Amino acid sequence: MKVDPNKEKALAAVLSQIEKQFGKGSIMKLGEDRSMDVETISTGSLSLDVALGAGGLPMGRIVEIYGPESSGKTTLTLEVIAAAQREGKTCAFIDAEHALDPIYAKKLGVDIDNLLCSQPDTGEQALEICDALTRSGAVDVIIVDSVAALTPKAEIEGEIGDSHMGLAARMMSQAMRKLAGNLKQSNTLLIFINQIRMKIGVMFGNPETTTGGNALKFYASVRLDIRRTGAIKEGDEVVGNETRVKVVKNKVAAPFKQAEFQILYGQGINRTGELVDLGVAHKLIEKAGAWYSYKGDKIGQGRANAGKYLTENPAIAAEIDKTLRELLLSNPAALSSSASDDENSEGNVDFETGEVF
């Protein structure tokens, strides 16, 4: 198809102007696999790191993770903290829900002795603490759990039944304007956990929305929709969840990709199981019947035993992880091609919110 050279020139000029004004990566072609050269922190899941395009969550940005109850939101953020601490980074957890379990966090690999934790009384206090930590330049990762629990001071001091229309949204809007610039300067990753609410009277499209108004949706560089898709059983006992995460917004790489992994109760993300699955899909690990082999050596009969072998041999697991990252991050499309046809449908996009449903 012939393209008008004047239009092509005008498009190049406006794209250059937009990127100059709003930053590199603020606009790109949907089919581009280009990712920005940004520092990232692993999410704890290889497939999610690949789906994000840059190899993890970007530093100096705002990230929103939302989903239904018990879908793995807090577990995912604790995995991010554990990964950051392994790199020697300082992390803080703003526990607005007053529900953080330090024993569970420790099981996921979080160094609780060096994790800063705050349980603020009001939403304003929580956001001021975030801003102070950000401006200090000494904290690398801040988690806020959750936006729905950031209650404005006026609402706390008022009575139950009082109307406070738009108060939380105004508070979040003001905080986002203040935080966004400081985060970039200090290279701090700020992750907000959010809950889902239903819009009343929606006949068509996605009735789901998130709390706290629209400011967070706008300022977030990455938005992740996390869902529990099934149960993992050992006999009759449920031992974990099958989890799917959709990247519904991404300003550092192409959006709308998705990742699937397992979250095991008391253990977190099943990394070795993920390595086995992706290794087989990309022919790094050979599978003959029920036996799995790596470089000609048998590593286990059945997926669980192969995963156990990798857990007991971290050097081999790290080697497979490194090879898969190099392969998949250079060609992110390979991740989706390894999924089964029924799990790889394109889905529908709500262009008002950027959500896939």
Curated annotation (Swiss-Prot):
List of residues binding ATP: 67-74
Record keyword Cytoplasm present: yes
Gene Ontology cellular-component terms listed: cytosol
Compartment(s): Cytoplasm
Keywords, in A-Z order: ATP-binding, Cytoplasm, DNA damage, DNA recombination, DNA repair, DNA-binding, Nucleotide-binding, SOS response
An example Gene Ontology biological process: SOS response
InterPro entries, A to Z: AAA+_ATPase, DNA_recomb/repair_RecA, DNA_recomb/repair_RecA_CS, P-loop_NTPase, RecA-like_C, RecA-like_N, RecA_ATP-bd, RecA_C_sf
MF terms in GO: ATP binding; ATP hydrolysis activity; ATP-dependent DNA damage sensor activity; damaged DNA binding; single-stranded DNA binding
Domain of life: Bacteria
Location of the region described as Disordered in the Swiss-Prot/TrEMBL record: 335-357
NCBIfam families for the chain: tigrfam_recA
Reported function: Can catalyze the hydrolysis of ATP in the presence of single-stranded DNA, the ATP-dependent uptake of single-stranded DNA by duplex DNA, and the ATP-dependent hybridization of homologous single-stranded DNAs. It interacts with LexA causing its activation and leading to its autocatalytic cleavage.
Family, as annotated: Belongs to the RecA family.
Protein name: Protein RecA
